[in-house]
Amino acid sequence: MGHSPVATALVALSLAVLAPCALAAPGFSDTLIGYRYSDHYTDPGKTKDVAKNILQITHVSSYRLGQNFINLDVFKSDRNDPAKGGGTGATEFYLTYRNQLQYGKFFDKPLAFGPVKDVALTAGLDYNTKNNEFASEKRLLVLGPTLKFALPAGFLDASVLYAREWNHCGLDVCSKPGNHTDLLFDPFFQFNLTWGVPFTAG
């Protein structure tokens, strides 16, 4: 199964830019562009530390019925994590998208009880591709309820998500009889906590 990291990056960046524009309404909106570097990353099957340059683009926004979260990480490895065929380090793209459809915004009255101020339905996907020998192509879909807790300031969300993952193995061993290059994993549940609480240091 071939893939083009450049094409994938364009698709991912298009999602990151266009989805919020299509869904956003008056409310909050924030975008972060960041950069990270370390020469002490470890990858499965690698005996040496891997140096990686990482570009991050994150966007969060509200819209009439809920809110969006989009994150794209672009990883560029050194030669200790080579691209297929060698000569340069591998490049990986990892896109995460989550959308919340809030009960209170849909019905104009929150579903509140105890410490919970509202309930939402969360849906989303993870999309990954990497141009090394393994050639992973992760496709993850998630769906499930989210409890939105009332806090004096900030937010706290707890989600239970039903998840299903598809992936790809480009190694020669995966093409041998009895093995598979395209993989479908058993369904599983994700338990996610997301929070942001302001505080003052010093």
Where do the model's predicted regions map?
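Transmembrane beta-strands of outer-membrane beta-barrel pores
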Residues: Y37-Y41, V74-D78, L125-N131, Y162-H168
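Hydrophobic, lipid-facing positions within transmembrane beta-strands of outer-membrane proteins
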Residues: T31, N53-I57, F93-Y97, R139-P145, ...
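Detector for outer-membrane/organellar transmembrane beta-barrel domains
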Residues: F134-G202
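Short glycine/proline- and aromatic-enriched beta-strand/turn motifs that initiate or cap beta-hairpins
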Residues: A24-F75
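Surface-exposed loop and membrane-interface regions of Gram-negative outer-membrane beta-barrel proteins
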Residues: N71-K130
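Short loop/turn motifs that connect adjacent beta-strands in outer-membrane beta-barrel proteins
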Residues: L23-S29, V60, L65-I70, Y103-A120, ...
